[in-house]
Amino acid sequence: MDEKRLTHLRQLEAESIHIIREVAAEFGNPVMMYSIGKDSSVMLHLARKAFYPGSLPFPLLHVDTGWKFREMYEFRDHTAKAYGCELLVHRNPQGEALGINPFVHGSAKHTDIMKTEGLKQALDKYGFDAAFGGARRDEEKSRAKERIYSFRDRFHRWDPKNQRPELWHNYNGQINKGESIRVFPLSNWTELDIWQYIYLENIDIVPLYLAAPRPVVERDGMLLMVDDDRIDLQPGEVIEQRMVRFRTLGCWPLTGAVASHAQTLPEIIEEMLVSTTSERQGRVIDRDQSGSMELKKRQGYF
């Protein structure tokens, strides 16, 4: 297809579909990570387009920490059922047995045990040799230098100094037994691209992305939504209703909301056009060196 005939979004769409089909043809046991957010929703939509009218030739995998927003769980189950997708859900049993949680053990330990170790357990359990992820290069500096085909050793570790060249849309998927590839079909998309494509294609998203009155507490300069009774209120903290939405979604005690009145997709897009901050400013796990994205990726995180 002549790229000159495609709009910017259609070029991105075509590239992503090409990558998804390439992985399905090249690897023996691929899986698509499904974290329930906007990027996962776009990636799933692209995968369904790639193999329409057939079904997906790989399952979805959600590595669950037990601390996602309730609306995320409802959306996950509804989506898998509506689209007829095979959904695998994995929780780290050792972490559950130890009662690991972000309030008691902190964001770094919670993320390492429930997310990173949970992910590695799931990949080993099912023997996946390729895993799709919805990460984009504009999100964060370590992701900006990562390849579309991201090689991982048999311990699931990423070495930024040992990456393969990717020239003219040619990807090297050769691996030895026990090694794997993380694949990022949305690498060249921006946050604005994602929202414009969601609007263009009428893709369903978790309602948390739209502004609404929600119960929040202000902590360390962030607005944390009180999603259930496990909240650990600190002295002086008061729960109040504010008009907020989320630019990124994760575990609710570690994800800050933003004050907003954007209740429709066009209003979100309008916000994006004037925004000067990263969507990951609301992620507690990105705020200190021990929780840096590159360090987590070296240890096996997505």
From Swiss-Prot:
Q: Which organism is it from?
A: Pectobacterium atrosepticum (strain SCRI 1043 / ATCC BAA-672) (Erwinia carotovora subsp. atroseptica)
Q: Which Pfam families match?
A: PAPS_reduct
Please state the pathway this protein functions in, per its UniProt record.
Sulfur metabolism; hydrogen sulfide biosynthesis; sulfite from sulfate: step 1/3
Task: Show the GO MF annotations.
Answer: ATP binding; sulfate adenylyltransferase (ATP) activity
Biological process (GO) annotations?
Answer: hydrogen sulfide biosynthetic process; sulfate assimilation
As for what it does, the entry says: With CysN forms the ATP sulfurylase (ATPS) that catalyzes the adenylation of sulfate producing adenosine 5'-phosphosulfate (APS) and diphosphate, the first enzymatic step in sulfur assimilation pathway. APS synthesis involves the formation of a high-energy phosphoric-sulfuric acid anhydride bond driven by GTP hydrolysis by CysN coupled to ATP hydrolysis by CysD.
Cross-referenced InterPro entries = PAPS_reduct_dom, Rossmann-like_a/b/a_fold, SO4_adenylTrfase_ssu, Sulfate_adenylyltrnsfr_sub2
Q: Which UniProt keywords apply?
A: ATP-binding, Nucleotide-binding, Nucleotidyltransferase, Transferase
Gene that this sequence comes from: cysD
State the family named in the UniProt similarity comment for this chain.
Belongs to the PAPS reductase family. CysD subfamily.
Against SUPFAM superfamilies, the record matches this protein to: Adenine nucleotide alpha hydrolases-like
| Subunit and partners | Heterodimer composed of CysD, the smaller subunit, and CysN.
**What does it catalyze?**
sulfate + ATP + H(+) = adenosine 5'-phosphosulfate + diphosphate
What is this enzyme's EC?
Answer: 2.7.7.4
- Which named protein is this? Sulfate adenylyltransferase subunit 2
